[in-house]
Amino acid sequence: MMEASPGLSIAITFAVILLALTGFSIYTSFGPPSKQLEDPFEDHED
C-alpha cells in the first residue's frame, strides 16, 4: 500500500469538511429546519 503525502491528506480533509459544511447549510436552508427560520424583512413594518 502506498503512503499518502501529508499535503494530499490535508487537501482531502479540507475538501471533506467543506462538503460537509455545504451539505449542512443546504439542509438547514431547504430541509425541515427551514420552517424555523424567520425573514427579518417580512417582520419589519414600514
Curated annotation (Swiss-Prot):
It is found in: Cellular thylakoid membrane. It comes from the Bacteria. Its main location: membrane. The chain crosses the membrane at residues 7-27. It is a single-pass membrane protein. The keyword ATP-binding does not apply. The keyword Thylakoid applies. Keywords: Membrane, Thylakoid, Transmembrane, Transmembrane helix. One of its GO terms (biological process) is photosynthesis. GO terms for cellular component: plasma membrane-derived thylakoid membrane. May play a role in photosystem I and II biogenesis. Belongs to the PsbN family. This is Protein PsbN. The gene is psbN.
